[in-house]
Amino acid sequence: MKDPIDDQIPKRIKHLQFGINGPEEFVKDGTVEVSRRDLYTMTDRSPAEHGALDLHMGTSNKQINCATCGESMADCMGHFGYVKLALPVFHIGYFKATLTILQNICKDCSSVLLSDQEKRQFLKDLRRPGIDNLRRSQICKRINDHCKKMRRCSKCDAMQGVVKKAGPLKIIHERFRYVRKSQDDEENFRHSFDEALKTIPELKMHLSKAHDDLNPLKVLNLFKQITPVDCELLGMDPEHGRPENLLWRYVPAPPVCIRPSVAQEGATTEDDLTVKITEIIWTSSLIRAALSKGTPISNLMEQWEFMQLSIAMYINSEMPGLRPSDMPSKPIRGFCQRLKGKQGRFRGNLSGKRVDFSGRTVISPDPNLRIDQVAVPYRIAKILTFPERVTTQNKKHLQDCIRNGPDVHPGANYVIDRESGFKRFLRFGNRNRIADDLKIGDIVERHLHDNDVVLFNRQPSLHKLSIMAHLVKVRPWRTLRFNECVCGPYNADFDGDEMNLHVPQTEEAKTEALELMGIKNNLVSPRNGEPIIAATQDFITAAYLLSLKDTFLDRKSISNICCYMMDASTHIDLPPPAIIKPRCLWTGKQVFTVLMKPNRFSKVLVNLDAKTRSFSRIKSKTPEMCPKDGYLMIRNSEIIAGVVDKSVVGDGKKDSLFYVILRDYGALEAAEAITRLSKMCARFLGNRGFSIGIEDVQPGKSLSSQKEILVNKAYATSDDFIMQYAKGILECQPGMDQEATLEAKISSTLSKVRDDVGEICMDELGPANSPLIMATCGSKGSKINVSQMVACVGQQIISGKRVPDGFQDRSLPHFHKNSKHPLAKGFVSNSFYSGLTPTEFLFHAISGREGLVDTAVKTAETGYMSRRLMKSLEDLSSAYDGTVRSSNSDVVQFVYGDDGLDPTYMEGDGQAVEFKRTWIHSVNLNYDRHDSAMLPYEIIDYVNRALDDPKFLTNCNRDFIETIRTFVIENIAKYLASVRERRDLAPMLEEPDMDDLDDMEGDEFAPVAKRKSVENIIRVTEKQLRSFVDRCWEKYMRAKVEPGTAVGAIGAQSIGEPGTQMTLKTFHFAGVAAQTTLGVPRIKEIINAAKTISTPIITGQLINDRDERSARVVKGRIEKTYLKDVTSYIEEVYGPVTTYLSIQVNFDTISKLQLDITLADIAAAIWNTPKLKIPSQQVTVNNTLQQIHVHTSSDGKSSETEVYYRLQTYKRVLPDVVVAGIPTINRSVINQESGKIELFMEGTGLQAVMNTEGIVGTKTSTNHVMEMKDVLGIEAARYSIISEIGYTMAKHGLTVDPRHIMLLGDVMTCKGEVLGITRFGVAKMKDSVLALASFEKTTDHLFNAAARFAKDSIEGISECIVLGKLAPIGTNVFQLIRRTEEEEEQKPKELLFDTPSLHQLEITA
């Protein structure tokens, strides 16, 4: 154990202040000035003094000690040096900041280009307390925009032009760019070139391009003149640094240990940074010599530029904008390259690092282990150790471990003395003596033992259940083994997967791991509360076979099976046999009774009604009479009816057996039940035998002949459609052309063939058929897989369509060109049993390849998406006041998920209680014949009183209380009343009025037989009702989200993890034919807050939603119609006086399209087309001929050629003029669902659609989040994000609790604008520099933080991990305050000047 009090507390970093070092700091921090180009001395090859490898900066040689601190290579942490530059140079990291400051100041007097009044206003905004980085950067942007527009300095009246970048690290000032008339300043500037023009007259032609060159020296002098107040306006803090520090005057030389020399065969290879430092020193010395001796200015400028590039590449070797000649021959690693990227310092060594006390090997299954155990090989157990402190209780055991030593298990590797801290390795020395000398308080690093806590992890770690705590079971052999039921959360299989093991090194860590990450506490997925640890594959098959109606066991067999599942310590009470004569037999279902309730002392009484996979309802019969025994009914842990299949013992179902035990009796009982099932099923199936062979998939003769008939019939139907298409008489489906209609019809015909053949195949295979058993019980495969093996593989689909034509208008060279026949487009009529023909094999391979490519692409896409989600949401946690806050205490949600409930504990679909099952459970547990039955009005009265209890009103959500009340009234009281009415008794929903004689008769005078018959059907007692209400309250309180829960991280994983199960390229037909993007691309669009999306669709409700004709009228108003759609022809007319285009309008088409337009409307559309620029007088309307004439210009000045070409232009552009509808709506589709008609519109323009006559504007929405925000505001955008992500997930059959999606929606919109989860959005969401640096654009964020003197308070998750600080989340969310007892009254200390001797005597007159 750790000592309770520790006086040696390590210091914790409270905050990081970023800034820019000035020359003084570089000299002060540096231990030596680096001024020599030589690395080693010529005499003895030792590091040269004042060279780049000077020993004062540390050493990279094991034999030499540091000259500054005297330590060896292992202990010296290194010291900085500095290089003094001959001339200042620009800093590549602050180049953008330098450019911005130059744009903001006068290039003569360095004053900020604002008036005094503007300065005061901006300073007031910048000095506002509590201002965040986003707001500050917006103010600085406004100042920059303002200054860029100023043409003269208000202080010195100097001209100001454009300051811009010219090539890498070059800034120019085009002072006279905006001068219209020549001014004195410009004249003077021009005259300054007179002398040069005399010498080189050719310069005159380039004089107009002359500009000021703002070299580093000039910029440095300008920056030195900036006043402290102006520094604030430039976004800098004059206390921490000034603008002139943005330029290099001294360059730091990093410690030698981060740029070590590699010695090889008498020579050394130097690090890239060392080489660059020598290059900088050499160039600087050349410039210094040139300045002292004098040299042509061109040479000096060239050397200065070279030094500038060298220093830039020293910082960032991937500097943009370099000429190929300036690029190094091989890429070098500058400072930026060492920090950024996956392998850089941030992501590779700070946020994520390699750890000690971890092991990795192949995994294999072992059903004999408990689900919370992991079998660890002896070899690993002897290497991984746990530091156990010696106490009186464990001293003897630890002494035995020490005597065994490191090579015998259970042994120990090290002993650490408590007083001296000396660590002793037990491979050497006298172990017996060491064991005898062991003192209380010493630490023994012992081997792993049984029941030690370890963390078990499989990569990729997609959600929090990818790393969980197991208990060790040390076993022989070489693999890590665990129970197969735990494969689900790890997504593990045993085809060669490897997994990692981590050993927590303190008692607190062990406890926390067990409580928070233990298997028993993580049986359900936090994504939606569904069970994730449950029976799998063979276990399900065995359970199914055992629970069939025809499975009977004698006493020997059932005793054997019961012993399979228990350990020797559990007492078993066999249930009474189901058949007594001629001999005692038990049913397979009774085995499950023992599994749930092994003996009479067990308190587990399961009550459950659930549909299994084989359930089919028969009219006029109760569900448990299902012919396939497909309705499971359990009462008090006894199976009354139903088989046990995947839906009962598998994962992903909330009405499964283990989930019910978990919710009613806790995690311990549920884990115990899963362990029993896995032991029993593995052993039972091993003895019974279960195999699959080729004869299992052999089709019978009748199946083959029926398949032949069905396939030939489908081919004939397809040929008929192809013939209609060829003749052009195929009737088009809504929103499709003939080709698309043909494809849709053939596809539906062929898919029906496979389904029909599959049905026949299922009927023909016997009940003992192994593949069919597996498909039926859900342990592996589906009925489609079986029918593909036996009967027919079916149509191959590529990107949602039949196989496309590859080359020369055909899918393969084996077919005719443009063939649409099923065989030519990927229909495989053979089964895998009969074998595929060569063409079928190729089609099947094409389809298979698409799946592989899709998976590979999807993995990278979803991985990056998950990382971005995690980075943006990781800081969010629930606080003690119920709010969800970010690390800097910004409120993101006032109540988590609008109700404060944890998705992990949701029993129903997003509800804390599954009322129906809870009611059945309460009724069966509290059944007593002697309790009096309640009447409907008594039930209502009791529940109203119970729900008005303060414990409900203060702790529960009002909606939850109302849901309970509604359930009891509708499902219990009213049902009882209806049963009474059917038995001719008064319903009694209201309390009888004692004054009314009719009411007084009541139940007392009703026949006993009738009352009994009602009670046989439904009998409600007060005890049952009380139990039900109490259970509801308990479950609700348990489901409340705990303070400190990392709701953000769990939400990010819950959205990111299902992404890996989604297909990538997925299109889905919304309604009839509006093709919408789904899957990963759609989720990406939403979380990126994309301005343009691939398939924007507006859904509009119609005022008259029953009449199709009125829907067509509205469609005509919305869908854009081109001129070419409503014209018969357009012809050119060349007359003696005028030439024009004659457009013949077809009013039959206009009436068919239900368009409300006239000739005048079409003419107006033509002259309003901006592309044509036709004056209105050139467009004339002829109503009698229903024609529009578009004339060429009437001025008569145009030549014949001009007139001809103008007519051709008109003729080309006019057909595409939009004459009706909304130009941004490409098309609209009428969709009829459940009798109601609605419109789907492809395109944008929500506001225009909402204002269209015939559309209900308040019930119109779009799937384009940004458009929703622009038209309806930020709340609408939030709702749109939530509904769109939910819809996309649901379309892929994935359930994600809405609370996770709501949190994402709130994070994206809580700043008042829709911020995408991208590097730009995250930068606006977070203020922390380290968090942004560990995400993307590492060095950019660090340079920006330094330039604006940012302060990082280190409160978020990323920052705390980088700096090794405990993150304020989970068990660390609270702070402890120790109240000291004041023994005596504290008196204030006397001040120095209160001492009388220090006072002068007062002199009185």
UniProtKB/Swiss-Prot annotation:
Taxonomy, superkingdom: Eukaryota
Pfam families: RNA_pol_Rpb1_1 (PF04997), RNA_pol_Rpb1_2 (PF00623), RNA_pol_Rpb1_3 (PF04983), RNA_pol_Rpb1_4 (PF05000), RNA_pol_Rpb1_5 (PF04998)
Reactions listed under catalytic activity: RNA(n) + a ribonucleoside 5'-triphosphate = RNA(n+1) + diphosphate
GO molecular-function terms, A-Z: DNA binding; DNA-directed RNA polymerase activity; metal ion binding
Enzyme Commission number(s): 2.7.7.6
InterPro entries: RNA_pol_asu, RNA_pol_N, RNA_pol_Rpb1_1, RNA_pol_Rpb1_3, RNA_pol_Rpb1_3_sf, RNA_pol_Rpb1_4, RNA_pol_Rpb1_5, RNA_pol_Rpb1_clamp_domain
Binding site for Zn(2+) 2: 106, 109, 153
Enzyme type, top EC level: transferase
Keyword tags: DNA-directed RNA polymerase, Magnesium, Metal-binding, Nucleotidyltransferase, Nucleus, Transcription, Transferase, Zinc
Residues that coordinate or bind Mg(2+): 493, 495, 497
Subcellular localization: Nucleus
Alphabetical GO biological process terms: transcription by RNA polymerase III
Signal peptide coordinates: none
Gene3D superfamilies: 1.10.132.30, 1.10.150.390, 2.40.40.20, 6.10.250.2940, 6.20.50.80, RNA polymerase ii, RNA polymerase II, clamp domain, RNA polymerase Rpb1, domain 3
Binding-site residues for Zn(2+) 1, renumbered to this chain: 66, 69, 76, 79
Annotated spans, Bridging helix: 838-850
GO cellular component annotations of the record: chromatin; mitochondrion; RNA polymerase III complex
Function: DNA-dependent RNA polymerase catalyzes the transcription of DNA into RNA using the four ribonucleoside triphosphates as substrates. Largest and catalytic core component of RNA polymerase III which synthesizes small RNAs, such as 5S rRNA and tRNAs. Forms the polymerase active center together with the second largest subunit. A single-stranded DNA template strand of the promoter is positioned within the central active site cleft of Pol III.
Family: Belongs to the RNA polymerase beta' chain family.
Oligomer status and interactors: Component of the RNA polymerase III (Pol III) complex consisting of 17 subunits.
Protein name stated in the entry: DNA-directed RNA polymerase III subunit rpc1
Lineage, broadest ranks: Eukaryota, Fungi, Dikarya, Ascomycota, Taphrinomycotina
Gene name, Swiss-Prot/TrEMBL: rpc1
